[in-house]
């Protein structure tokens, strides 16, 4: 079975891969761009979505994405980490990295798989 994890641009690619192929059985997207409603309707993989609370550009697409996943009957989990910035899991970026949120999100990701 195939699963994928992506961060930022890579998170958006996980969303697109899930829409493009039934081969993906599980996907985890960290603060990636949401697919269109048409793309989301094609997703069959289980999905886990992680978002930063302080990420208006990415988060503006989340409600429509989640509604499309629900309408398509996709099993998904979505988490918003309040008070953290986009790229909160990137420990090479001290201005954005949040160790507590990163550890929680990664633990959830490992548990998901």
Where are these regions (language model features)?
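Alpha/beta-hydrolase fold nucleophile elbow
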Residues: 1-7
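Short beta-strand/loop motif that positions the catalytic acidic residue
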Residues: 43, 48-51
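A short beta-to-alpha transition loop/helix N-cap that caps and shapes the active-site region
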Residues: 34-39, 57-58
């Amino acid at each position: 079975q195939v699963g994928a994890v992506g961060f930022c641009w890579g998170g958006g690619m996980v969303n697109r891969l899930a829409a493009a192929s039934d081969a993906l059985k599980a996907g985890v997207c960290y603060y990636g761009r949401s697919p269109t409603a048409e793309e989301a309707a094609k997703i069959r993989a289980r999905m886990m979505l992680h978002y930063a609370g302080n990420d208006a550009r990415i988060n503006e697409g989340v409600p429509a994405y989640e509604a499309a996943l629900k309408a398509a009957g996709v099993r998904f989990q979505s988490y918003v980490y309040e008070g953290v910035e986009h790229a909160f899991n990137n420990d090479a970026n001290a201005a954005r990295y949040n160790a507590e949120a990163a550890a929680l999100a990664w633990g959830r990701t490992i548990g998901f798989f």
